[in-house]
């Protein structure tokens, strides 16, 4: 898992971050597309 995975997951689950914010973390290389799918529950699409 990426270093920020748990923190990003907790932000998303708490409603502090939207799906678009988590998606931006993938494009910035902070988390992987696979981690996005685990957090959001949807397939990552650019």
What label would you give each PLM region?
Residues 1-46:
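Viral virion structural and adsorption modules
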């Amino acid at each position: 898992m990426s270093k920020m995975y748990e923190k990003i997951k907790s932000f998303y689950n708490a409603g502090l971050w939207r799906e678009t914010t988590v998606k931006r973390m993938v494009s910035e290389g902070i988390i992987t597309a696979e981690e996005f799918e685990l957090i959001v529950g949807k397939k990552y699409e650019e």
